C-alpha cells in the first residue's frame, strides 16, 4: 500500500504471546505439507470459569478472549461467491472454507465485521461424524474483537480436514474499506456506481468471514455474479462466464496462488482498458472509467518496463499470467498491491499530458514501481505480523529508487530519494517517534504502523545497508530471501540471515566462491563477519527509535567521533536531555571524504566514541558521502566554518548530494540547539551560485518555511525582510525561468518551485504573467493549454479574485483529469476569504463535488495559510465525531487531519488548546500516537521561535 500525498507534496505489548515453534503435518498427511509457525495446546474447549471469556451479542459466553486468532484451525482454501447489487447497494455471498485442524477443538474462530451471517454448516470427507452434508453450526458474535465463533456439536479431530460453509450478506460500504461503493461522473454528467474492495490491513473481514491475519495464507477460488453491462475483475484471470436466468452473468476465476487475505480483491464496474504483453508473456492491463481511457497509456508503458525489470532483478518470474492496474474514483490510499489486481487512486495511475506536470509523472512512475515491487515483497513473501510491516513497505519504497533509476533514468529519481529520508527525519528526531518494528495488536494500532517510519525510514536504512554491503551482495541477499520464503511468511531475522549469507545455488553450481568473493572490494568491509554481524548492526536501526547524531571534531590529522541520539526541540542544557540519551547506541556505517582526496573512506562506529587518523592534513572533512547514511552530522570547532568557506569559494569541489546533505543537516542542527541560526543562514549565501536544482530547492525550502512561519504569526517586520532577502538573492534565477515545460525533470521542478515562491511573495512580473495566462484560459472557456509545470501557479493567482475562484470551482467539477483537479483544488485553497475556504471544507465533507478522499489533504493545505489555519482547526474540533464516521480512527486520513491542522502552531496558548482537546476525546482517539507527536511538534516550534527569533531578525537586518 502507498499513501497518497499528491496534493500536499508529498503506519503494546502483545495481548496474545504465541511461543513460536515449528511443526509439519507431512508425516501424518503425506499428500499435504502444511508448515507453519505456531504452537498450540492439546485441545480447545470451553472454560468452566464464566468470567474467563467475553460475552457474545446474544448474551452467551464467547469461547475466545484474545485479539489474535487461535492457530488450531488453519485455512487451506476458500471457495467464495459474491453477488453485489449496484442498485440496492448491498451484496449477498457465500463461501466454503477448507480447513485443517491441528488439535481437537469445539469451536472455530474467524474474523467478521458488519456481516449478517444467515447460515453456517460443517462437513468433512475424513470425519465420519460430519460426512452428511449441512451439519448446522451455532454462530456467536463478539464485535469488540471483530470475531465470530462457530460452535460444533462434537469436537473436531486433529489432523483432519473439514469444510465450513457460510452464507452472509451486507450493505456495500460508504467508506473506503472492505467491499464498498465508488462513484464517477461521465462527460455527459451521469453518475455511475462500481463496487470495489480494499482489505489492507484488517478489512477482508468486512467482505467475507475469514482468518484475517497475514500468517493464514490460503488459495482462493472466486465467483462473481453481475449484470451484463458490467465487468468483473479479480486477482486471477477469468476462466469462464455462465449465463443465468434474468440476464445475469457469473464469472469464474482461476484459483489463486497461496496468499494472505488482505491481498484478495474483486471489482464490478463498467471500465475500459488498454493492454500489453511483457517479454515473459504476462498480460498487463490498465483499467479506468471510459472517459479517462486516454490517460492510461503512460501507465501501461511504465508497468510493462517495470515488470520486466523486476523479473530480471529478483531472478523470479511474476507468478500469475495477468496483472491488472485499475484507477478507482474513490480510494483512501495512493494504491494497494492486491496480487494480480492493483488498485490505485486516479492521481497515482492516470497521466494526462495536457494537465500532468513533471512531478505528476514522477509520482505515477514511483507508485507503479512501488506496487509492482509488492508483488514480490509482501505478496510472494509476507511478514509474519503487522509489527514488521516495514519488511514489505520499506522494501517497496526502496525498490522505487532501484527500479525507476533503471527504467526511467531521465526522471532523475536518484536525487529525489534524499527527500524520502529527509521527510522521516522530521518525525524520527522527536522523542515521540517509534522503532521501525513495534508491537501492534488492535486494528487501530496496526493502521498506525502505516507511517513514514515503516515506509521512508525502512527504505533509507535499506539503502544505507546496500551502500555498506555493496550492490551485488545486497541484491544476491534479497534474491535468496525471496526464493527461500516464497509463498511463506518471514520476520526481521530471516532478512538479516539472507543478507549475511547471500550465496545463491548458482554460485556453487558454477564453481563460484560466495562467502569471500574477492570481486567485492569497493564496498565490502573486511571485518564484516558472520550472520550475527548484519543482525547485530541492523537491530540497532529497527528495534530502537530515533536517528543518531555524529559529532566530529578535527584536530590536525586526528578525527574524534562521538555518537548521540539526535533530538529536535530538546537542547543539551534542558534537564531531560541526558535521560533521553541513555541506552541509545547505533552501529553506524560511516563514510567520509576530505578536501585532499575524493576517495570514500569507510568505518563502522559501534561505540559512543572513537578516533580516526587521517593519512594527510586536510582543510575539511565531509561525512555521510552522498547522504546514503541515515544520520545527522555536526562538525564541532571550525568544521562548519571550513565547509561554508568551501561552498562560497568553489562549491563544486563538494559532490552535489553532499551539498544537499549539508544544507539539510545545518538547519536540522539549529532545531536541535547545536548551531546558531545565523550560521545556517550564512550558508545560504552560496546558493546564488548553485546550479544543482536539488541543492537550490533544499535551501529555498527552509527559507520559505521561515517566511510562512512568520507570516502565520503575523511577525510582519521579519516576514517582509525575508521576502526582500529571497527576492534580492534569488531574483536572477527566478527571472531566468520560462513559463514552459522545457528542460530536465529537475529543471521543471525547480521552475515550478521558484515561480510558485515568486508569486507567493507577490513578485510583480510573476503575478503579471500568471494573471495574463489565467485571463486567456478563462476567455478560451478552459480550452487553452497552459504549460503543466506552471498550471498550479496560474490557477492560484487566478483564484484570488471572486470571479476567478468561482470559475475554477466550476471547472473542477467538469474536469476529466484528476491531475488538473488536484491543481485547481490547491488553488482554491489559497483564497484569503474564509467563507470560500469553509465552503471547500463543507463540499469535501459532503463528498459530491469534492470527493471525501481529498478532505484530509484539503484541510492540510488550507491550514498552511494564515487565513486558513484557525479555520481548519476549529472545523476539526467541531466536527470530530462526523470525521470519525468517514475515516477509521487510526487511518492515514485522520492522522493527516490532526497533524495538518495543528502541527504548525507555535504558541503556548495553542499548545494548551490542542492538549485540552485531545484530552477531551477519551475513547474517541486520545490514545493515538499522532497526538503525542503533534504536542511535541508544537512544543518544538515554540522553543525554536524563543531561541531563534532575535537571531533571525538581526541577521536579516544585516543581510538585506
UniProtKB/Swiss-Prot annotation:
Catalytic residue positions: 371 (proton acceptor)
Biological processes per GO annotation: adaptive immune response; peptide catabolic process; proteolysis
GO CC terms of this entry: endoplasmic reticulum membrane; extracellular space
PROSITE patterns: ZINC_PROTEASE
Cysteines paired by S-S bonds: 421-460, 759-766
Cofactor or coenzyme needed: Zn(2+)
Lumenal side: 41-960
Membrane topology (UniProt): Single-pass type II membrane protein
Cofactor note: Binds 1 zinc ion per subunit.
GO molecular function: metalloaminopeptidase activity; peptide binding; zinc ion binding
Residues carrying a glycan: 85, 119, 405, 650
Binding-site residues for Zn(2+), renumbered to this chain: 370, 374, 393
Keyword annotations: Adaptive immunity, Aminopeptidase, Disulfide bond, Endoplasmic reticulum, Glycoprotein, Hydrolase, Immunity, Membrane, Metal-binding, Metalloprotease, Protease, Signal-anchor, Transmembrane, Transmembrane helix, Zinc
Transmembrane segments: 21-40
Record topology, Cytoplasmic segments: 1-20
PTM: N-glycosylated.
Annotated EC: 3.4.11.-
Function summary: Aminopeptidase that plays a central role in peptide trimming, a step required for the generation of most HLA class I-binding peptides. Peptide trimming is essential to customize longer precursor peptides to fit them to the correct length required for presentation on MHC class I molecules. Preferentially hydrolyzes the basic residues Arg and Lys.
Family: Belongs to the peptidase M1 family.
PANTHER family per UniProt: ENDOPLASMIC RETICULUM AMINOPEPTIDASE 2 (PTHR11533:SF239), PROTEASE M1 ZINC METALLOPROTEASE (PTHR11533)
Assembly and oligomerization: Heterodimer with ERAP1.
Name of the protein in its database record: Endoplasmic reticulum aminopeptidase 2
Source organism of this protein record: Pongo abelii
Underlying gene: ERAP2
Amino acid at each position: 500500500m502507498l499513501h497518497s500525498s499528491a496534493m500536499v507534496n508529498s503506519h503494546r505489548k502483545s495481548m496474545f504471546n504465541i511461543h513460536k515453534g515449528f511443526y509439519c503435518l507431512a508425516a501424518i498427511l503425506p499428500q499435504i505439507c502444511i508448515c507453519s509457525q505456531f504452537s498450540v495446546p492439546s485441545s480447545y474447549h470451553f472454560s468452566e470459569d464464566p468470567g474467563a471469556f467475553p460475552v457474545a451479542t446474544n448474551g452467551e459466553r464467547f469461547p475466545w478472549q484474545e485479539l489474535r486468532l487461535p492457530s488450531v484451525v488453519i485455512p487451506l482454501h476458500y471457495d467464495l461467491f459474491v453477488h453485489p447489487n449496484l442498485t440496492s447497494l448491498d451484496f449477498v455471498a457465500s463461501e466454503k472454507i477448507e480447513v485443517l485442524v491441528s488439535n481437537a477443538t469445539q469451536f472455530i474462530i474467524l474474523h467478521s465485521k458488519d456481516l449478517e451471517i444467515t447460515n453456517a454448516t460443517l462437513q468433512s470427507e475424513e470425519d465420519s461424524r460430519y460426512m452428511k452434508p449441512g451439519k448446522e453450526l451455532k454462530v456467536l458474535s463478539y464485535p469488540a474483537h471483530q470475531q465470530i465463533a462457530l460452535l460444533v456439536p462434537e469436537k473436531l479431530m486433529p489432523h483432519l480436514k473439514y469444510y465450513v460453509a457460510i452464507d452472509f450478506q451486507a450493505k456495500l460500504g460508504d467508506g473506503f474499506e472492505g467491499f464498498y461503493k465508488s462513484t464517477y461522473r461521465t462527460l455527459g454528467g451521469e453518475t455511475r456506481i462500481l463496487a470495489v474492495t480494499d482489505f489492507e490491513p484488517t478489512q477482508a473481514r468486512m467482505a467475507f468471514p475469514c482468518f484475517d491475519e497475514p500468517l493464514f495464507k490460503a488459495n482462493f477460488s472466486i465467483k462473481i455474479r453481475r449484470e451484463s453491462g458490467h465487468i468483473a475483475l479479480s486477482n486471477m484471470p477469468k476462466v469462464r462466464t455462465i449465463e443465468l436466468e434474468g440476464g445475469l452473468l457469473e464469472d469464474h476465476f482461476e484459483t489463486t496462488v497461496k496468499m494472505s487475505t488482505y491481498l484478495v480483491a474483486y471489482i464490478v464496474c463498467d471500465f475500459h482498458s488498454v493492454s500489453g504483453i511483457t517479454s515473459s508473456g504476462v498480460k498487463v492491463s490498465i483499467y479506468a472509467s471510459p472517459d479517462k481511457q486516454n490517460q492510461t497509456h503512460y501507465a501501461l508503458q511504465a508497468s510493462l518496463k517495470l515488470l520486466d525489470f523486476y523479473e530480471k532483478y529478483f531472478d523470479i518470474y511474476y507468478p500469475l499470467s495477468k496483472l491488472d492496474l485499475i484507477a478507482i474514483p474513490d480510494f483512501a490510499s495512493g494504491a494497494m498491491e492486491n496480487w494480480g489486481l492493483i488498485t490505485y487512486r486516479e492521481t497515482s495511475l492516470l497521466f494526462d499530458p495536457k494537465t500532468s506536470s513533471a512531478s505528476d509523472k514522477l509520482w505515477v512512475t514511483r507508485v507503479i514501481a512501488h506496487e509492482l515491487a509488492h508483488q514480490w515483497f509482501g505478496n510472494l513473501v509476507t511478514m509474519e505480523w503487522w509489527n514488521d510491516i516495514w519488511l514489505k513497505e520499506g522494501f517497496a519504497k526502496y525498490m522505487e529508487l532501484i527500479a525507476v533509476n533503471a527504467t526511467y533514468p531521465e526522471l532523475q529519481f536518484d536525487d529525489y530519494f534524499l527527500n524520502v529520508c529527509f521527510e522521516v527525519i522530521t518525525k524520527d528526531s522527536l522523542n515521540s517517534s517509534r522503532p521501525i518494528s513495534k508491537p501492534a495488536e488492535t486494528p487501530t494500532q496496526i493502521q498506525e504502523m502505516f507511517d513514514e517510519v515503516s515506509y521512508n525510514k525502512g527504505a533509507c536504512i535499506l539503502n544505507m545497508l546496500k551502500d555498506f554491503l555493496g550492490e551485488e551482495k545486497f541484491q544476491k541477499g534479497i534474491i535468496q530471501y525471496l526464493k527461500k520464503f516464497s509463498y511463506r511468511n518471514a520476520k526481521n531475522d530471516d532478512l538479516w540471515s539472507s543478507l549475511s549469507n547471500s550465496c545463491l545455488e548458482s554460485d556453487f553450481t558454477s564453481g563460484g566462491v560466495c562467502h569471500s568473493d574477492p570481486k567485492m572490494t569497493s564496498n565490502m568491509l573486511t571485518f564484516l563477519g558472520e550472520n550475527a554481524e548484519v543482525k547485530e548492526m541492523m537491530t540497532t536501526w529497527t528495534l530502537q527509535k530515533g536517528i543518531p547524531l555524529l559529532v566530529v571534531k578535527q584536530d590536525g590529522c586526528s578525527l574524534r567521533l562521538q555518537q548521540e541520539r539526535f533530538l529536535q526541540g530538546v537542547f543539551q542544557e534542558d534537564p531531560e536531555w541526558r535521560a533521553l540519551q541513555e541506552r541509545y547506541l547505533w552501529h553506524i556505517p560511516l563514510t567520509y571524504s576530505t578536501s585532499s582526496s575524493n576517495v570514500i573512506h569507510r568505518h563502522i562506529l559501534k561505540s559512543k566514541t572513537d578516533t580516526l587518523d587521517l593519512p594527510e592534513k586536510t582543510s575539511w572533512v565531509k561525512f555521510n558521502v552522498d547522504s546514503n547514511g541515515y544520520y545527522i552530522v555536526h562538525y564541532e570547532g571550525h568544521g562548519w566554518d571550513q565547509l561554508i568557506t568551501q561552498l562560497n569559494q568553489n562549491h563544486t569541489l563538494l559532490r552535489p548530494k553532499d551539498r544537499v546533505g549539508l544544507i539539510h543537516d545545518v538547519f536540522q542542527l539549529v532545531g536541535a540547539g547545536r548551531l546558531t541560526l545565523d550560521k545556517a543562514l550564512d550558508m545560504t549565501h552560496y546558493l546564488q551560485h548553485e546550479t544543482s536544482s536539488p541543492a537550490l530547492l533544499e535551501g529555498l525550502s527552509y527559507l520559505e518555511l521561515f517566511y510562512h512561519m512568520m507570516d502565520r504569526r503575523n511577525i510582519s517586520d521579519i516576514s517582509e525582510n525575508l521576502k526582500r532577502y529571497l527576492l534580492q538573492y534569488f531574483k536572477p534565477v527566478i527571472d531566468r525561468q520560462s513559463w514552459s515545460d522545457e528542460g530536465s525533470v529537475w529543471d521543471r521542478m525547480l521552475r515550478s518551485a521558484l515561480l510558485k515562491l515568486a508569486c507567493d511573495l507577490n513578485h510583480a512580473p510573476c503575478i503579471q504573467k500568471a494573471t495574463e495566462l489565467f485571463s486567456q484560459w478563462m476567455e478560451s472557456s478552459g480550452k487553452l493549454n497552459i504549460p503543466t509545470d506552471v498550471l498550479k501557479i496560474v490557477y492560484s493567482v487566478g483564484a484570488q479574485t471572486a470571479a476567478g475562484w468561482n470559475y475554477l470551482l466550476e471547472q473542477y467539477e467538469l474536469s476529466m483529469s484528476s491531475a488538473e483537479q488536484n491543481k485547481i483544488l490547491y488553488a482554491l485553497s489559497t483564497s484569503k476569504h474564509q467563507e470560500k475556504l469553509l465552503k471547500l471544507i463543507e463540499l469535501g465533507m459532503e463528498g459530491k463535488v469534492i470527493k471525501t478522499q481529498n478532505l484530509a489533504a484539503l484541510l492540510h493545505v488550507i491550514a498552511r495559510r494564515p487565513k486558513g489555519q484557525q479555520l481548519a482547526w476549529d472545523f476539526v474540533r467541531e466536527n470530530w465525531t462526523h470525521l470519525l464516521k468517514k475515516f477509521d480512527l487510526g487511518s492515514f486520513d485522520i492522522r493527516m487531519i490532526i497533524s495538518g491542522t495543528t502541527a504548525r502552531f507555535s504558541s503556548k496558548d495553542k499548545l494548551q488548546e490542542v492538549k485540552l482537546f485531545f484530552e477531551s476525546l477519551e475513547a474517541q482517539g486520545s490514545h493515538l500516537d499522532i497526538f503525542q507527536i503533534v504536542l511535541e511538534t508544537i512544543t518544538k516550534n515554540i522553543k525554536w521561535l524563543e531561541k531563534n527569533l532575535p537571531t533571525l531578525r538581526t541577521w536579516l537586518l544585516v543581510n538585506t
